Regions:
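Short, solvent-exposed loop/turn segments at secondary-structure boundaries
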Residues: 56, 84-85
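C-terminal capping alpha-helices of c-type cytochrome domains
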Residues: 86-105
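Electrostatic cytochrome c docking/interface patches
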Residues: 16-35, 68
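N-terminal export/targeting leaders of redox proteins
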Residues: 1-24, 105
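Gly/Gly-Pro-rich "capping" loops immediately C-terminal to redox-active cysteine motifs
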Residues: 31-32, 41-77
Length: 105
């Protein structure tokens, strides 16, 4: 019985660690896209990224949720171009998770 309890606890710790690593990887990938691939930082201010763009909205102030970021990145808005076709759906999701997680924090 003790061995089964140990196995169960170990399994949950392993899953928690794996999920945390995956979340950190997604944030790192999203930040890289924000800074280097889509170069969102040239227009947007986001403290976590160290960006101070003055053209687009200050993302720390508006604190957009993931869906809002995804729709805006996919379709563009105002002078911001659409990135659907430029970024993969996985990249759009990663940058959306990154921005919605760190904005205003």
């Amino acid at each position: 019985m003790k061995k089964n309890n140990f196995n169960i606890v170990f399994f949950f710790i392993l899953i928690s660690f794996t999920l945390n690593v995956k979340a950190n990887d997604t944030l790192s990938i999203g930040k890289d896209i924000f800074l280097n691939k889509a170069v969102c930082s040239s227009c947007h201010m986001l403290e976590d990224a160290g960006s101070n763009g003055m053209i687009g909205p200050n993302l720390d102030q508006i604190r957009p949720d993931k869906n809002r970021v995804m729709m805006t990145v996919k379709n563009g808005i105002g002078i911001m171009p659409a990135y659907e076709g430029e970024l993969t759906s996985e990249e759009i999701e990663a940058v959306s998770i990154y921005v919605s997680t760190v904005a205003g924090n």
